[in-house]
């Protein structure tokens, strides 16, 4: 389903990238006196911010449209969250901290809740 892919990319994957790379890793670069490297990613952060405004509106509208839509979105979100977290864990643990990926997961879950989703997650 194209909307499942839309949700996976724009909410889950981009959510992890934003939190881990453009928040946590960027902050680490600043603490290592590498602010000039962090500045190189400014365009990507701006682009993801613009995309987020649009994709959040689309997801929020789809979730509010019907109970069936909300149920599907919740199922897709819950299924993809664990896979994406597992994919980012090795890098996040090596580059940042052991709990970095958990912080990113919580940020993505909070964003999903703001969009009207109610993910049925064991650890949330």
Predicted regions and their residues:
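Acidic/His metal-coordination segments adjacent to aromatic residues that form catalytic metal sites
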Residues: 1-11
């Amino acid at each position: 389903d194209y909307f499942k892919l839309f949700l996976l990319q724009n909410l889950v994957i981009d959510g992890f990238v934003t939190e881990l790379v453009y928040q946590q890793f960027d902050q680490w670069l600043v603490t290592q006196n590498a602010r000039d490297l962090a500045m190189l990613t400014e365009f990507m952060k701006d682009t993801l911010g613009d995309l987020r405004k649009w994709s959040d509106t689309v997801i929020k509208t789809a979730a509010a449209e019907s109970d069936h839509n909300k149920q599907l979105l919740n199922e897709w979100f819950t299924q993809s969250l664990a896979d994406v977290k597992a994919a980012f864990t090795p890098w996040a643990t090596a580059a940042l901290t052991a709990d970095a990926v958990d912080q990113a997961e919580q940020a993505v879950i909070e964003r999903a809740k703001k969009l009207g989703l109610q993910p049925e997650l064991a650890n949330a």
